[in-house]
Amino acid sequence: GLGDVYKRQVMLMDSAGNVIGKSSLSLLNGKSLEDEVYTTVRDMGTLAVPVSLIPVLEKGNVSLSDTVDVGNGIYNHNGKEIRDHNADMGGYGEITLQQAILFDSKVGVIKSLSPYTTIKTTYSPTEILNFYHSIAVSDHSICSAKTMKEIQQTFEMVVSEGTGKPLFSDNVKIAGKTGSVIKEDGKHEVSFCGYFKVNNAVYTCLVIISNPKNGYPSGGIMAGDVVKEIVNYLDR
């Protein structure tokens, strides 16, 4: 199926919301899947969490400072085992909802949000890129100024102290979120979506890497390297 052909996908959007660059190292029967890859709805994993988080913050059901006990990082939700990436090392224990986002704790997010909403993770890459672009340019049609600021601060903290730390750069401030998906066949997919400012222009970038070959599959390191290359290219 389509799931096996993705290797690496990159999309770059400018301040106006135009996609100015995309590349996909995906070939199926020798044909490039360019546009289909970007518009096909699929499991975007934890990259999609902020989309579900915003309405819950807006309603005041939760706040980012709420605490949640994720225990050892293994949680049974509706008969399905949810595992945090550090479950083998004992989990995060008690953390805030904001930290659950910073550290990409699926258990923390599900325990915090599932009483109020169903966390939807199936979107096309283009939809996810558009969402992060809305945050990048402070599009208040998606939420109040207060929530917008909270999400932007959280995305900045992902890079300064969370799973996006490998993206930290002294020259260009990058903000966003790392993502991960474990497919049904056990294969991994890691990603980063975020934004940065170069020469007074705001760019939004999505990187997805499938079946990462080297080392522990981390969106911060693997997808982050690609984002840094793009930043350096634009910041020449």
Residue ranges of predicted features:
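Short, small-residue-biased leader/transition segments that mark boundaries at the very start
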Residues: 1-6
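Surface-exposed patches in mature extracellular/periplasmic domains of secreted proteins
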Residues: 7-13, 65-67, 111-113, 139, ...
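Active-site beta-strand/loop architecture of penicillin-binding DD-peptidases
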Residues: 20, 114-139, 155, 159-236
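Flexible glycine/proline-enriched surface loops and loop-helix/loop-strand junctions
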Residues: 32-39, 81-82, 90-95, 102-109, ...
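Short, glycine/proline-biased beta-turn/loop segments that scaffold the active-site neighborhood
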Residues: 23, 42-97, 103-105
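A short, well-structured edge-of-sheet supersecondary motif
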Residues: 7-32, 194, 205
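Active-site SXXK
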Residues: 17, 40-68, 100, 115, ...
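Soluble non-cytosolic domains of exported or imported proteins
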Residues: 42-47, 91, 95, 99, ...
